[in-house]
UniProtKB/Swiss-Prot annotation:
Pfam families: Pox_RNA_Pol_22. This is DNA-directed RNA polymerase 21 kDa subunit. The gene is OPG103. GO terms for molecular function: DNA binding; DNA-directed RNA polymerase activity. GO terms for biological process: viral transcription. It comes from the Viruses. Its EC number is 2.7.7.6. It catalyses: RNA(n) + a ribonucleoside 5'-triphosphate = RNA(n+1) + diphosphate. It is found in: Virion. Belongs to the poxviridae DNA-directed RNA polymerase 22 kDa subunit family. It comes from Myxoma virus (strain Lausanne). The DNA-dependent RNA polymerase used for intermediate and late genes expression consists of eight subunits Rpo30/OPG66, Rpo7/OPG90, Rpo22/OPG103, Rpo147/OPG105, Rpo18/OPG119, Rpo19/OPG131, Rpo132/OPG151 and Rpo35/OPG156. The same holoenzyme, with the addition of the transcription-specificity factor OPG109, is used for early gene expression.
Amino acid sequence: MNPHNVKYLAKILCLKAEIQKNPYAVISKDVVHRYSTDIRYGDLTTIISVRHKTSTSNTVFQVFNESSVNYTPVDNDYGYPIIITSFLQTGHNKFPISFLYIDVVASDVFPKFARLSPTDVATVYSVLQIGDTKDALKLPRMLETEISAKILFHKDFPLKIVRFFKNNMVTGEEISDRSLVAVLE
């Protein structure tokens, strides 16, 4: 973990703070501009404070290397330690160092995505139903280890389907839904 990795991680944590504030928010790289960050870098523990610019809500994230997790909640704490790992692992709070080599959020390929509301989930499942039979079409799947699933985690709202938005010059905005699949360890 170095200061550059932590700066890139702070942008991802801004997106997680937006989901804590509004679980059904549409996440894109523009969301980062709504937040300011205060990073207190340390070799073993880094404290990242994420403050919303207009509502002044503050969320504090404690970041640890996977070998030295010493977590105790503080004021305005996120509720979970953020752990930098060597490899891709399950868990919404575990980010592999490979995610942090570049500024993923600022990338042109960073997706625009959102969690579906319960009524939207029911609508999607009803559309996938084949007639009156018990058979149903399946959505494309995504692993819970993908960064979009890690960002969309909220303890009170389980994530079932992620909706991705893609701009199309001809048809406007296209949507594609993907169902979340748990990774077996």
